[in-house]
């Protein structure tokens, strides 16, 4: 499986997870390797899925941690990590974030 990180995902990962960024990324990749379709499809976002990851800095587990958004390209065995939210900040996407993710999904699918 090949993992691809969008620039918005990488920025948010380092902004939110800070010194735990590598640990969070490793946990996300491990979860997706065991089940790439684990996240639920988000309606209207072109195949983007949403799943949870824990925030080791808080020690709260997945429910109080991060929400990450990704695309799974089964035929290419690729996963594109597209965005990350902190549960304390928001449990879901605002209109601007939805617009960004639709654009990232369209761009990723056109490259496939």
Give the predicted meaning of each segment:
Residues 65-84:
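Short, hydrophobic/aromatic-rich beta-strand segments within well-structured domains
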Residues 87:
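Short, conserved catalytic or interaction motifs in soluble domains
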Residues 1-62, 75-76, 90-112:
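Basic, Lys/Arg-enriched alpha-helical interface segments
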């Amino acid at each position: 499986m090949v993992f691809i990180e969008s620039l918005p995902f990488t920025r948010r990962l380092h902004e939110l997870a800070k010194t735990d960024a590598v640990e969070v990324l490793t946990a996300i990749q491990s979860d997706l390797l065991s089940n790439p379709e684990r996240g639920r499809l988000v309606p209207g976002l072109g195949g983007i899925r949403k799943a949870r990851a824990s925030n080791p800095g808080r020690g709260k587990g997945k429910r109080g941690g991060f929400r990450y958004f990704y695309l799974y390209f089964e035929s290419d065995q690729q996963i594109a990590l597209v965005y990350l939210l902190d549960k304390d900040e928001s449990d879901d996407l605002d209109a601007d974030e939805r617009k960004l993710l639709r654009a990232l999904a369209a761009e990723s699918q056109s490259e496939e």
